Amino acid sequence: MNALIAVQNNAVDSGQDYSGFTLIPSAQSPRLLELTFTEQTTKQFLEQVAEWPVQALEYKSFLRFRVGKILDDLCANQLQPLLLKPLLNRAEGALLINAVGIDDVAQADEMVKLATAVAHLIGRSNFDAMSGQYYARFVVKNVDNSDSYLRQPHRVMELHNDGTYVEEITDYVLMMKIDEQNMQGGNSLLLHLDDWEHLDHYFRHPLARRPMRFAAPPSKNVSKDVFHPVFDVDQQGRPVMRYIDQFVQPKDFEEGVWLSELSDAIETSKGILSVPVPVGKFLLINNLFWLHGRDRFTPHPDLRRELMRQRGYFAYATHHYQTHQ
């Protein structure tokens, strides 16, 4: 298992009262905050959105914002700014979100509604070509024959950014645990760029800004290659990344060696967090300066984990990738 970084004081005022939810620092890192909706908020939200099945959210995209407004109204309109503030804050940028009373696979549709509401308070989730919807649900089992590491249980899924092989801006990534059976291990792995001890070395390398080709396997349903550098800067000139080791295609020896060394430097970082995510909870991270992955599982013939993801853009910020949008 990867090492945890030391717990430090967090800027969040744990004594502040919020309406409908709590917000506290996590045990893993001062950069990761835990937001929990109260049982009453959860119950009222599900009652007020019950008239819309998930299919309605799929077909009518404006309803995704409607359910977001319902959730924010239940939280006295404190929720939206308190989601955006840490997500746009370089010192934080990550939330672990939970709703009391949503914790069973039988509530999978309710989980999708909740995650959709949260995501559409900060921006809009992009079309996911793998699923054909604005979200994707997928299952990890003990045996896998797919064409990427996404569903392979017995190895580490290396740290990466999402949205590397599409042209849409991918500011945020949301990853929700829908089901888990006969499961040991498989924690989420996170690395904040500013906690990566080799950032300066690789960010200043001549290849850091060279556009490289990114190509996805057939399961992603994306046939067009995209070109962009591994590193870029935000509006304030700070490093951001668009990187995944599986899909970047080096054109020559120089690029291949550099990418291999970069991968090793990321995977061996002492700043990696190992974060358990129970059923019903989800991580929401700033994709520009957080890398994410997954630790390996302990083998079991009936192992099963179901996940849901959404990824999209912030509607309230302009500091995307500055040179290669």
Curated annotation (Swiss-Prot):
SUPFAM superfamilies in alphabetical order: Clavaminate synthase-like
Record-listed Fe cation binding positions? 160, 162, 292
EC number(s) of the enzyme?
A: 1.14.11.64
An individual GO BP term: L-lysine catabolic process
Q: Name one Pfam family in it.
A: CsiD
- Keyword Metal-binding on this protein? yes
Q: What sort of enzyme, by top EC class, is this? A: oxidoreductase
UniProt keyword Iron present: yes
InterPro entries the record matches: GlaH, TauD-like_sf
Keywords from UniProt, A to Z, are: Dioxygenase, Iron, Metal-binding, Oxidoreductase
A Gene Ontology molecular-function term? glutarate dioxygenase activity
Q: Which domain of life is it from?
A: Bacteria
Q: Which reaction does it catalyse?
A: glutarate + 2-oxoglutarate + O2 = (S)-2-hydroxyglutarate + succinate + CO2
Q: Which Gene3D superfamilies match?
A: Clavaminate synthase-like
The annotated subunit structure for this chain is: Homotetramer.
Per its database record, what is this protein's job? Acts as an alpha-ketoglutarate-dependent dioxygenase catalyzing hydroxylation of glutarate (GA) to L-2-hydroxyglutarate (L2HG). Functions in a L-lysine degradation pathway that proceeds via cadaverine, glutarate and L-2-hydroxyglutarate.
**Which family, according to UniProt?**
Belongs to the glutarate hydroxylase family.
Q: Which HAMAP family would you find in this protein's record?
A: glutarate_hydroxylase
Q: Name it.
A: Glutarate 2-hydroxylase
UniProt organism field: Shigella boydii serotype 18 (strain CDC 3083-94 / BS512)
Q: Which gene name belongs to this protein?
A: glaH
